[in-house]
Amino acid sequence: MFLAFDDTDSLESMCTTFLATELIKALGVYDLIGLPRLMRLNPTVPWKTRGNGALCLRLGIGRGEPTMVGELDDMPVYSYGRTAEEADPEFVLTVAEDVISRLARTEEGASPGLVVSAAKPAQRFYWQAVRGIVEKTDVLQELQRLGADLVGWEGGRGLIGAT
């Protein structure tokens, strides 16, 4: 199950990678599958945030040998190369929505987007977001095609980077 989010910080505060650590802790009943994916988006868009990055975590019950990928609160964080079972999308969505609602800097202009999906979007969305401008209407059509769950705050512009 893929959990992706974007536009949670402002030019003044918050950090997408910090939010990822909070989500990993809050969703600790699940394992990381693979490494967290940090996407550096087009730095020339007029609405960029501090780092202009989005993050994607794949969550589930891991299978095989775990690899230690870091520490959070003095506890090791492990990642698995394969999944034995996907995470429950409703649970992931509920927990992630709560964490993002509490920590996103909407009062400072953030326009967060959260996507939970069993399938990845077409690769062209990634490359277009890195190199150009992506229209939100195109993203919404792709997310609908995938059957993804999504939440947007303050216009949900972050759905673009989260796709």
Residue ranges and their predicted role:
Residues 1-163:
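Conserved mixed alpha/beta catalytic, RNA-binding, or beta-rich assembly cores of soluble enzyme
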